[in-house]
């Protein structure tokens, strides 16, 4: 697996990601980052890291412009587009598909989306899944079994994984602040996944998360 950082596409944030040991990142977009897609892309191209993926910001699913601009940025950077919004359910996938994304893309699983629903609403319809471990932990009592099954059965449709800690109520926690069996999760990913693993914790916690994963897999 390839460990990837996460940060906004500003020069200081990108430099800091490189200082934490990352050579690639997933971009956390804010509305202002899409005011000038060419300028945002140029900032990346001049930075010490590359963009592995671009995460749409949390726009309303019936507002196509933010999604299309995110797609345009991903295209310019030759990056993967993570289609996700707190306002969109997986039942909105047909609407989002109608925006005709040109970059390779996948849909991130929402909190509460079970393995069964992800198979029915996304994977068995041919869509890629960006598998968020925290959201899966919040959705599946047999979390490790579900994680393993999804990677085993649909690995060719899961190019990006988000790895973070979580409780059943709160996600995006620093490693060790939640209840996910992190080392066992890392073992499952190491055994069944060879794509990008985005350490989706706050920037100041990413170096520690990276160190822990490397130690577990040593």
Located regions from the model:
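N-terminal pre-domain/capping segments
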Residues: 1-57, 61
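A cross-family glycoside hydrolase active-site/sugar-binding cleft signature
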Residues: 2-8, 26-28, 52-57, 82-84, ...
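Histidine-acidic metal/acid-base catalytic patches
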Residues: 3-18, 63-67, 75, 117-118, ...
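Short, charged/polar "capping" segments at the starts of alpha-helices
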Residues: 12-13, 33-38, 89-92, 115, ...
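Active-site acidic/histidine proton-transfer and metal-coordination neighborhood
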Residues: 19, 45-52, 56-130, 138-139, ...
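Short acidic/polar active-site loop segments enriched in Thr and Asp
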Residues: 23, 50, 79-80, 159, ...
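Short, mixed-charge, low-aromatic patches
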Residues: 25-31, 106-110, 140-146, 168-170
């Amino acid at each position: 697996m390839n460990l990837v950082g996460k940060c906004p596409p500003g020069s200081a944030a990108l430099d800091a990601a490189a200082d934490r040991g990352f050579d690639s990142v997933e971009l956390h977009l804010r509305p202002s980052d899409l005011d000038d897609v060419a300028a945002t892309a140029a900032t990346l191209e001049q930075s010490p890291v590359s963009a592995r993926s671009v995460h749409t910001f949390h726009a309303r699913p019936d507002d196509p412009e933010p999604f299309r601009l995110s797609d345009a940025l991903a295209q310019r950077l030759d990056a993967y587009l993570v289609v996700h919004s707190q306002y969109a359910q997986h039942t909105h996938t047909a609407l989002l598909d109608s925006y005709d994304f040109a970059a390779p893309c996948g849909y991130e699983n929402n909190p509460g989306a079970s393995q069964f629903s992800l198979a029915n609403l996304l994977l068995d319809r041919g869509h890629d899944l960006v598998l968020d471990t925290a959201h899966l932990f919040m959705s599946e009592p047999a979390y490790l079994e579900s994680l393993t099954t999804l990677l085993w059965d649909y690995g060719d449709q899961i190019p990006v994984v988000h790895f973070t800690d979580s409780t059943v109520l709160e996600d995006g926690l620093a490693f060790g602040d939640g209840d996910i069996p992190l080392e066992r999760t890392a073992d499952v990913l190491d055994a069944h996944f060879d794509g990008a693993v985005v350490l989706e914790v706050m920037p100041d916690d990413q170096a520690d998360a990276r160190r822990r994963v490397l130690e577990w897999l040593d």
